[in-house]
Swiss-Prot record:
Predominant subcellular localization, coarse grouping: plastid
Stored Gene3D superfamilies: MFS general substrate transporter like domains (1.20.1250.20)
Transmembrane portions of the chain: 105-125, 148-168, 182-202, 205-225, 240-260, 265-285, 345-365, 381-401, 410-430, 441-461, 477-497, 503-523
Protein name: Plastidic glucose transporter 4
């Protein structure tokens, strides 16, 4: 998932670029769009052209898979799950069976990803519309109120990310999606019809609550209904649809130059996928894991039949119950996340998102326009295309390797590449011996950084979190980790430009390189590999190692 640095930073980047790089208003306006567009790299690449690669990944994910829409199960076999710390081992039976499955998962993953589309769309829609809505609402000269319109989405998302876990545990995953559609639709409607700044901010706040809930439950639901063999590939689809939402927002802004009031339509159109999400989830199966955990075994059997086929009902219900999903242990409370039993794994989830935000994606986003111009690339569109292509390629590669190379390996490779890229960027600005090549080196460093980020640091955390958390704490722990993401995102947005002004961009880049190195060391020592394991196997491994 990605994560999102757009909201506060788009506005801050605009102010900085207007002050530093351009005095021409039209150029500044382009700078807003470009900076916002690239900051979406933190949510993942513009992955639209990667759909063919995704299809190939799904088709190759396991030799037993006969087609993308009909999953074959591989032979059941014992897998020795190694614990993450003490080296203890547990024998577990994966949720697999022999024979061809008559169920299908993809349509329901697609419905869930409407939430991801809305996530990306609401992040990106204000980027092109801000200048026009500011004029329409009479705040063209008031950058403070413009900042509130932008950043209120982040505030709402922080609330939503914490709320999503509790709702998912209490009402179930599908019902929470339906509840989530309410603030998403109302927020979009208020923004589209706003006649005052106050109404606009309330609309953005509600939309933020909606995308905050989506950021928690979309990866959670997908991970819980996906077959073990292709869970990594399906989990990375979340990134794809976030980027489709971002791209849709970018395209939706094209008529603005000819029709300044088009910004209202841009916000209003988001009501449609919100309604479709609510309707689609009314026909989608609930997570079998949640149902068994609630003691609703008969409903779980129906969900398993829909998702995996009637051939697997008995086997999967038995395995889910045996793994502890059906135990009478009460649902975990928020304070349980900080207990000695769970804190280690919860801290891993929070740390991954903190490293993601502190590793410098914001700096690369902010300065990419000036970096490309220093290399003679004057077109913002060309620069965006280059950064976008790097994102597309990186995530396409990551999705194809997710179930082969593994999540942990991708994270290590990603943060290692980001560290080297940051070092190259820092040297390109300060090392006089490289002055003649500084522009070219800066572009190379930027592209390599974005490519490295999209290989692991961008897409893996949102996929990994639902996998490493025990079923009893999964929803709340995912929500807590994503809440840390939104909070750190907001804080970085407030102080980043001040730090750059005081220390200089080269020193800041060097600091980011150090953070990436720390991330590599932390991941190597604390993150457990989840490739090829069922969620039950992972839970056994982490519990035995606690």
């Amino acid at each position: 998932m990605q994560s999102s640095t757009y909201a506060v930073k788009g506005n801050a980047a605009f102010a900085f670029q207007r002050r530093t790089f351009s005095s021409d208003r039209s150029t500044t306006s382009t700078g807003i769009r470009f900076a916002g567009y690239k900051s979406l790299a933190t949510t993942g690449p513009l992955y639209c052209s990667g759909s063919e690669a995704m299809g190939a990944t799904l088709a190759r994910a396991d030799n037993g898979i006969q087609s993308v829409m009909s999953f074959s199960s591989v032979k059941a076999r014992s897998v020795r799950a190694q614990a993450s710390s003490d080296g203890d081992e547990e024998e577990a039976i994966p949720l697999r069976s022999e024979g061809k499955s008559s169920g299908t998962v993809l349509p329901f993953v697609g419905v869930a990803c409407l939430g991801a589309i809305l996530f990306g769309y609401h992040l990106g829609v204000v980027n092109g519309a801000l200048e026009y809505l500011a004029k329409d609402l009479g705040i063209a000269e008031n950058t403070v109120l413009q900042g509130w319109i932008v950043s209120s989405l982040l505030a709402g998302a922080t609330v939503g990310s914490f709320t999503g876990g509790a709702l998912a545990d209490k009402f179930g995953r599908t019902r929470t999606f339906q509840l989530d559609a309410i603030p998403l639709a109302i927020g979009a409607f208020l923004c589209a019809t706003a006649q005052s700044v106050q109404t606009m901010i309330v609309g953005r706040l509600l939309a933020g609550i909606g995308i905050g809930i989506s950021s928690a439950i979309v990866p959670l639901y997908i991970s819980e209904i996906s077959p073990t063999e292709i869970r990594g590939a399906l989990g990375s689809v979340n990134q794809l649809f976030i980027c489709i939402g971002i791209l849709a927002a970018l395209i939706a802004g094209l008529p603005l130059a000819a029709n300044p009031l088009w910004w209202r339509t841009m916000f209003g159109v988001a009501v449609i996928p919100s309604v479709l999400l609510a309707i689609g989830m009314a026909f989608s199966p609930e997570s079998p894991r949640w149902l068994v955990q609630q003691g609703k075994v008969s409903e779980a059997e129906k969900a398993i039949k829909t998702l995996y086929g009637k051939e697997r009902v008995v086997e999967l219900v038995r395995d889910l119950s045996a793994s502890g999903q059906g135990s009478s242990e009460p649902e975990a409370g928020w304070f349980d996340l900080f207990s000695s039993r769970y804190w280690k794994v919860v801290s891993v989830g929070a740390a991954l998102f903190l490293f993601q935000q502190l590793a410098g994606i914001n700096a690369v986003v902010y300065y990419s326009t000036s970096v490309f111009r220093s290399a003679g690339i004057q077109s913002d569109v060309a620069a965006s295309a280059l950064v976008g292509a790097s994102n597309v390629f990186g995530t396409a590669v990551a999705s194809s390797l997710m179930d082969k190379m593994g999540r942990k390996s991708l994270l290590l490779t990603s943060f290692g590449g980001m560290a080297l890229s940051m070092l190259l960027l820092s040297l390109s600005f300060t090392w006089k011996a490289l002055a003649a090549y500084s522009g070219t080196l800066a572009v190379v460093g930027t592209v390599l950084y974005v490519l490295s980020f999209s290989l692991g640091a961008g897409p893996v955390p949102a996929l990994l979190l639902p996998e490493i958390f025990a079923s009893r704490i999964r929803a709340k722990a995912v929500a807590l980790s994503l809440g840390m993401h939104w909070i750190s995102n907001f804080v970085i947005g407030l102080y980043f430009l001040s730090v750059v002004t005081k220390f200089g961009i080269s020193s800041v880049y060097l600091g980011f390189a150090g953070v990436c190195v720390l991330a590599v060391l932390y991941i190597a020592g604390n993150v457990v590999e989840t490739k090829g394991r069922s969620l039950e196997e992972i839970e056994l491994a982490l519990t035995s190692g606690a």
